């Protein structure tokens, strides 16, 4: 600890007022009057530009979380007034848009309460000593005027502080150049720990709630890991793309076991169960390092290197793209490379994680295209969890592309060149990229049989040629087709971060136990069902070879915790192990070294 503390503002009060020279600025005030009611109070002043009617909306979703959330559902006590405080007529234009009759006022002020009672990566939360929100939650916008700059001030209980990705200091105002920057701003208010360190000349802040979760041992390990992650990824991409970066951590306790992260242009917001955050000695949990590496690499891949289907963002509706396998899955691959290249992971850890990705790909209930999965992620399919599939399959695809590029070029080219070219030729030119653009770059950098690879494995459903592909980097594949434990339940993650049974397979162990749709999975045998790890993979490994053994399912049904009894069943499945060849050829060794160290050449 002991680093410089940045961006901390104490209680601020603010009267919304129009200031002629900056009339185009939208001004917001966020206040907390009664934390126990879980209500933020929001005021926003919009210039009318002489319009008789102003349309104001809240987003339907948050970029990075590809799910319609409809944030307008949390609004109550909406009102609209003119510059002198006189009430103005308003009504609802659609589910998320308010229509206000301006009465020829030069500016109007809208106000509302916002319910914040959910632990989620893209939903607001407020309690006795702490609050958290994303810009998409609280800040209305004027459709068609996302270019407007904005200012935000806070009115908070005594002793509360503010840490936000927005630019500002002291009591504010905090500023955003346009609505996209405002919508992307993660914010903590309340009492929590704030630390900071400088990496590559830029400040990196760490905000952790609750404060007592950030012990000296945790601080030491967190700072060391983040420094290595940032240095490694900054070096790959040519330096940090931000003025300052913030890592927001929300450490939660049982019975909620939700974990994950959400990327932002100058921040990441991570939720982690206390049991997975650190151990008793303050060492970071197994999921922590890959999570931080993944979210940090999103600074480039998706926040800046973005599919054209999401350029610019449309907050009103779904934005479909077939490229989430690249934006999320290849980001997973680069997170793994970061951990290897920085020394945070050993070679064995890297190969084990890759093998686990392969296990997940092969365990899919049916052959599927990662492009189709990218598009379908918005609907939370009943039988296939698309988002849980294009992450591992995209990661494996990234590694196969990397090895193929290095093999074809004698290690003078690799996927690093492709990701950097996407950054300079598309993001830095102010545009998104398409599948055709990506394929053109892969072709330019020497990807052999690109059209065939794309049609078979990315847009197609053929199994990956693991053995032939990995052999080029001197990696041996141990493929075992065995009987693996099979529970027989499809349980997607709910908005509350719980795994809820949706479909129970006929004749399965789950059906024999009496598991029913709507049951919340808590434990499968002795395995806690948590989102910070793939519990289904853990289940298969833990109960391998135990067909017929007793198996207890702990679930929550109708508010009660009950135990259901069944027996382990198995079905045919594939598991993988990866290891380095003890006697690689010179070329194999060169390719592996280039991949592992991020180098090209002889």
Predicted feature locations:
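A surface-exposed beta-strand-loop module
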Residues: 32-33, 64-127
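Surface-exposed beta-strand/loop patches in extracellular or lumenal glycoproteins
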Residues: 40-72, 140-157
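Post-HExxH zinc-binding segment in Zn-dependent metallohydrolases
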Residues: 268-270, 275, 304-305, 316-367
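Juxtacatalytic substrate-recognition/specificity segment
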Residues: 195-324
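C-terminal recognition in membrane/secretory proteostasis and scaffolding
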Residues: 335-336, 344-602
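Extended, low-hydrophobicity, Ser/Thr/Pro/Gly-biased non-transmembrane segments
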Residues: 112-193
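Zn2+-dependent metallopeptidase catalytic core
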Residues: 71-77, 115, 147-163, 167, ...
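Short, hydrophobic/aromatic-enriched beta-strand segments in well-ordered soluble domains
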Residues: 42-48, 58, 98-128, 150-158, ...
């Amino acid at each position: 600890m002991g680093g410089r503390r940045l961006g901390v503002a104490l209680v601020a009060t603010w009267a919304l007022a129009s200031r002629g020279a900056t009339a185009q600025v939208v001004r917001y005030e966020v206040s907390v009057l009664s934390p126990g009611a879980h209500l933020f109070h929001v005021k926003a002043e919009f210039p009318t530009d002489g319009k008789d009617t102003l349309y104001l909306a809240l987003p339907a979703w948050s970029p990075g979380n590809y799910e319609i959330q409809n944030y307008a559902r949390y609004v109550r006590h909406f009102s609209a007034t003119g510059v002198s405080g006189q009430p103005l007529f308003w009504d609802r234009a659609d589910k998320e848009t308010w229509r206000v009759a301006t009465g020829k006022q030069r500016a109007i002020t809208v106000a509302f309460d916002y319910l914040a009672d959910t632990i989620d990566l893209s939903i607001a939360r407020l309690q006795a000593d702490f609050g958290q929100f994303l810009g998409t939650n609280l800040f209305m916008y004027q459709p068609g005027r996302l270019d407007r700059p904005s200012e935000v001030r806070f009115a908070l209980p005594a002793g509360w502080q503010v840490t936000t990705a927005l630019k500002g200091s002291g009591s504010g105002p905090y500023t955003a150049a346009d609505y996209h920057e405002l919508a992307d701003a993660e914010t903590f208010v309340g009492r929590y720990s704030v630390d900071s360190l400088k990496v590559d000349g830029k400040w990196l802040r760490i905000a952790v709630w609750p404060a007592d979760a950030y012990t000296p041992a945790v601080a030491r390990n967190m700072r060391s890991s983040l420094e290595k992650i940032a240095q490694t990824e900054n070096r790959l991409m040519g330096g940090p793309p931000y003025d300052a970066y913030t890592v927001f951590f929300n450490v939660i306790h049982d019975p909620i076991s939700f974990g994950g992260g959400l990327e932002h242009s100058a921040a990441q917001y991570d939720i982690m169960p206390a049991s997975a955050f650190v151990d008793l000695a303050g060492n970071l949990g197994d999921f922590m390092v890959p999570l931080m590496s993944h979210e940090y690499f999103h600074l480039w891949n998706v926040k800046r290197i973005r599919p054209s289907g999401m350029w610019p963002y449309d907050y009103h509706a779904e934005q479909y793209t077939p490229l989430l396998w690249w934006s999320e899955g290849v980001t997973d691959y680069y997170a793994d490379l970061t951990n290897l290249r920085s020394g945070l992971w050993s070679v064995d850890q890297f190969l084990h994680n890759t093998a686990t990705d392969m296990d997940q790909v092969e365990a899919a209930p049916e052959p599927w295209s990662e492009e189709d999965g990218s598009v379908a992620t918005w609907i939370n399919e009943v039988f296939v969890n698309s988002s849980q599939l294009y992450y591992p399959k995209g990661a494996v695809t990234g590694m196969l592309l990397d090895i193929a590029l290095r093999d074809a070029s004698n290690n003078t080219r690799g996927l690093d060149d492709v990701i950097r070219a996407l950054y300079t030729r598309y993001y830095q030119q102010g545009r998104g990229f398409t599948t055709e653009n990506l394929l053109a770059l892969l072709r330019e950098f020497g990807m052999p049989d690109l059209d065939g690879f794309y049609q078979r494995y990315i847009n197609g459903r053929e199994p990956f040629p693991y053995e032939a592909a990995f052999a080029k980097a001197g990696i041996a594949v141990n493929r075992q087709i065995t009987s693996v434990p099979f529970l027989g339940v499809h349980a997607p993650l709910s908005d509350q971060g719980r795994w809820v049974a949706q479909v129970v397979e006929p004749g399965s162990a789950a059906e024999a136990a009496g598991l029913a749709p709507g049951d919340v999975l808590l434990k499968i045998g002795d395995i806690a069902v948590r989102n910070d790890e793939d519990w289904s993979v853990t289940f298969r490994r833990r109960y391998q070879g135990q067909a017929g053994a007793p198996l207890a399912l702990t679930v929550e049904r109708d508010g009660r915790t009950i135990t259901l009894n069944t027996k382990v069943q198995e079905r045919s499945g594939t598991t993988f192990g990866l290891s380095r060849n003890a006697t690689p050829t010179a070329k194999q060794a060169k390719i592996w070294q280039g991949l592992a160290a991020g180098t090209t050449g002889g």
